[in-house]
Swiss-Prot record:
This is Putative ankyrin repeat protein FPV228. ANK repeats lie at residues 39-71, 72-122, 123-152, 156-185, 190-226, 227-254, 258-287, 291-320, 324-353. Pfam families: Ank_2, PRANC. The keyword Repeat applies. SMART domains: ANK. It comes from the Viruses. Gene3D superfamilies: Ankyrin repeat-containing domain. The keyword Zinc does not apply. Keywords: ANK repeat, Repeat. PROSITE patterns: ANK_REP_REGION (PS50297), ANK_REPEAT (PS50088). PANTHER family: ANK_REP_REGION DOMAIN-CONTAINING PROTEIN, ANKYRIN REPEAT, PH AND SEC7 DOMAIN CONTAINING PROTEIN SECG-RELATED.
């Protein structure tokens, strides 16, 4: 008890900077040094916290162990690295250089006395780990210059580089990289490399800067963590970092344990800008992910018209089914999204597709759950397909759809109106071989441009309800084409071989060209 009391007395004397009492206690009370070294109230560590160089020298001169530790296993160098001696507000605002420079003589004193610069605390952290974490570049430089080991792992497998990256400490990162720290070591918890950590930094400028530093020092851009994900998976919140990874060889179609690629993740999180960037860099728009879902499937689940359009414009196949053979159209109709459903149908989604349970997109739900606008859109499409393609009526999905329609009065009434409108359109003759329904049923619309100003069309359209908007859309497109057609005809009729041909023949030739081809001819002539 007397020894313990004396140690506490010594500790108190150090804390109030009473050097006379310290010397007196050490000389007269015969306290065994080992007791002091292992006591929780360690006078040397207290002197370090107080940045009291003279007191530190005094204690060391009297034999206090230079590598003495606190209950957490921290030595004096650990405490210096953690900025224990800096007021909290100064650390918070980054104004602690003056305090750090005060410690340089103390640090040098410890190094002259052969302090263990690679000592590990209870978490297996060295002073280098903690200096990197607190961005104590002064201590970091001194430790590195004195051959501190840069690749020691803490109990979680983190190197000092992991700490510096998490702390967003760019200067510390540069220092460590200049001393050949291994940039590709992965920790034990998530198997994160420093690059995994860097791409998850919220600030895009800092993230890009750190990622660039790591990549310049041969960081593996495709290293995988415990979830089998590469750093690119964590860059979906920072487009600049994403581009940097892609420009340095990141595998854009790499998949995780659940088979999803980055484009699935971006679509699931409704990130239009990221999806567009991935597509611009060559991501597979039809990549099969978790449970057979494509990016379009996720976009449909998220009611995201904009993302769906982007994917479809880049060639997404709307008929790729998931693990139970549901296509995005099943989801769109289930969600009663009329705009999304229309876009899928216009892009070639198969309304007669049958899933593993023998259901089609409209039999998938109870008929009374499908809103009237969606029902009109879908049933009018089915009637259109039946009119255009005779073989459709033999398909199991079509037979199932017709059965659902006929067994539900509202659906059957819609079907009858659609069929009546087709009969009416066929009665509006435009030529010996063409009638108003040709604008909906004919896949080669270019040949119909010649009839576009026939007054019968505009008079008759007003009598049509369900297919009116479809007709107006087609006619508007053809009117624009006619303007382009007539412009090109005027430009080329007197050029080369064309001046020897009748205008009707030239016009027929132009009918076989696409709108894009006509536009190019108009530009270059």
């Amino acid at each position: 008890m007397l020894i313990m009391s004396s140690i506490k007395e010594l500790y108190h004397a150090v804390s109030i900077n009473d050097r006379f009492s310290v010397v007196n206690i050490l000389e007269k009370k015969n306290i065994p040094i080992d007791y002091i070294n292992f006591h929780p109230d360690n006078p040397l560590l207290e002197a370090v916290k107080l940045t009291n160089t003279d007191m530190i020298k005094t204690l060391l001169d009297y034999g206090i162990c230079i590598n003495t530790r606190d209950i957490l296993g921290n030595t004096a160098l650990h405490l210096i690295a953690m900025d224990y001696y800096v007021p909290h507000n100064d650390i918070k605002h980054g104004h602690h250089n003056d305090y750090v420079f005060k410690m340089v003589p103390i640090i040098n004193l410890f190094l002259r006395k052969k302090a263990n610069i690679n000592a590990c605390n209870n978490l297996n952290q060295t002073p280098l780990h903690l200096a990197a974490e607190s961005n104590n570049t002064t201590l970091l430089k001194i430790l590195l210059y004195n051959n501190a080991k840069v690749n020691i792992l803490d109990i979680y497998g983190n190197t000092c580089l992991h700490y510096a990256v998490r702390g967003r400490n760019i200067e510390s990162i540069k220092l460590l990289l200049s001393y050949n720290v291994d940039v590709n070591i992965r920790n034990f918890t998530y198997w994160y490399s420093a690059l995994h950590e860097a791409v998850q930094i919220g600030d895009s400028k800092i993230s890009r800067c750190i990622v660039s530093l790591l990549l310049c020092n041969k960081a593996n851009v495709n290293t995988r963590c415990r979830l089998n994900t590469t750093p690119i998976f964590y860059a979906i919140n920072c487009i600049d970092t994403l581009k940097l990874l892609l420009e340095n060889g990141a595998d854009i179609n790499a998949t995780s344990d659940n088979d999803n690629a980055v484009i699935h993740l971006a679509t699931e999180n409704r990130r239009y800008d990221i999806i567009k960037t991935l597509l611009d860099y060559g991501a597979d728009v039809n990549m099969i992910g978790y449970r057979g879902k494509t990016p379009l499937y996720y976009a449909t689940e998220n009611y995201s018209y904009r993302n769906m359009k982007l994917l479809l414009d880049h060639g997404s196949n709307p008929n790729i089914a998931d693990h139970i053979m549901n296509t995005p159209l099943f989801i769109s109709i289930k969600c009663t999204c009329i705009e999304n459903t229309k876009m899928l149908l216009d892009s070639g989604a198969d309304i007669n597709h049958v899933n593993d349970n023998g259901e089609t997109p409209i039999s998938y739900l109870a008929p009374n759950l499908i809103p009237t606008p969606v029902a009109i859109l879908v049933i009018s499409h089915i009637v259109l397909l039946k009119t255009k393609y005779n073989h459709i009526k033999y398909l199991p999905g079509f037979i199932k759809n017709i059965s659902v329609i006929q067994n539900f009065t509202k659906f059957n009434n819609i079907k009858k109106v659609c069929e009546d409108e087709f009969r009416f359109m066929r009665s509006v003759s435009l030529s010996a071989n063409h009638n108003l329904s040709s604008y909906i049923c004919n896949d080669n619309l270019h040949t119909l441009v010649r009839f576009i100003k026939n007054p019968k069309i505009y008079y008759s359209i007003n009598k049509i309800r369900i297919y009116r908007n479809r007709l107006y859309s087609i006619i508007e497109r053809l009117l624009n084409r006619k303007k382009l057609h007539d412009l090109v005809l005027e430009l080329i009729k007197d050029i080369g071989v064309f001046n020897k041909l009748p205008l009707d023949i030239i016009s027929m030739i132009l009918d076989f060209l696409s709108d894009d081809d006509l536009a190019l001819m108009a530009i270059f002539n």
